[in-house]
Amino acid sequence: EGQAQAGERPGPRLTFSADEDTALTLIPTQRLTPQTPALDSPAPQSPTLQRLQAELAEKRPGALKAFWKQVAKQGTPLVEPLDAERVLVTFLWRQQRPGDVRLLWPTPEVNTRRFEALAGSDVRYLSLPLRRDARVSYQLSADLPDLQQADRGTLRLALQAAARPDPLSRTPWLNSRALPRAEQASLVQLGGAPAETWDQPRKDVPRGKVERLGYSSQALANQRQLTLYTPPGYDPEGQRYPLLVLFDEDHYARDVPTPTILDNLIAAGRIRPTLAVIVGNVDASSRGRELPCNEAFADMLAHELLPWLQQRYALSEEPADRVLSGSSYGGLASGCIAYRYPERFGKVLSLSGSFWWGPDEQQPQWLVRQFAAGERLPLAFFLSSGLLEEPEADGILGSNRSLRAALQGKGYPLHYREFPGGHDYAAWSLELAEGLQALLPAH
């Protein structure tokens, strides 16, 4: 059935549902053969590979062995100067036998490009120009069938099924270490990327209390998981606390360690002590129904969940102390709910928000047009999207730029950032920390 992947447009997904005692058998009906790399591969851009190519052409003894020895020593990808603002990043895979190799990367067009084969060798490679401050997670997929004619959804499913971290990389994405092997990733973090990150535990930093529980909604007649965070030293008698409401609990309590980020920011005096509730999805299909400007879901948050939290915690009564946040569809939901209930939620922290969304093809960028046409509401925004995301009007980067223009035209308080990355939790973990500092500063 069609499902959305991480807030992207729907693509195919295989879902099984059966009683406990039912046996399911998969019977292949088509065999896809591995793709043999083209013999007329273009000359490599990488100076390192150009030198290797020349040495192989000269039949220099031991050239290939020495190359792989050096790669193992320094790790991958190769990073070589390109110009004042960019470097050439070359991903490598070692394979002599036929079979497609691809990069699983948080921007769609790169996933459609195969690794090239260096003639006369077992070197497969893909070179990309990147900004000198890029930070992007990635995986590699090998031994793939011929996917040249596959649509985007089929291609992504095939890449995910074969995905693995880069075996030659020395930089794992640390937040993925506890995940299943197929979900672990490597990290490109170039020299100009921010040195300070907030998503790793720090010594001697007090930790807040984290609790996971089920929450039932009468209005929606469903149940979901919540992760609740209370800051270190929480005193219900002493003060009233800001509230962060964050969507996609399965990712923002795991891929992005939100409690750790909050612990570190609070301890460093960057933000006020803040409570957080990370709201889970009912199931895989509910995300695409509830988060894209769903009035019933917004009503549940405003009339059920918020009062439920207020009864249990010492929360500020000020809408300006309540932040809605999420990535992709979660960023869209944050904007839509604040638009519907500005008297309850006063701030929006959007990470690569899917503002291209419309209820149908005739109404693209629906939320952008609402803010552009309506009166200014008592809201403040932090918008962040990646330079590797789609710049077109119906893409993430393009629609975020459209929303920026609409908000600026109305005079909304706005922090706007374009980060050198893609649709990627490795980037969003940094951007979440930036947004919290912008919207809930300690001073």
What kind of region is each of these model predictions?
Residues Q5-T25:
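Noncatalytic modules at the cell exterior or secretory-pathway interfaces
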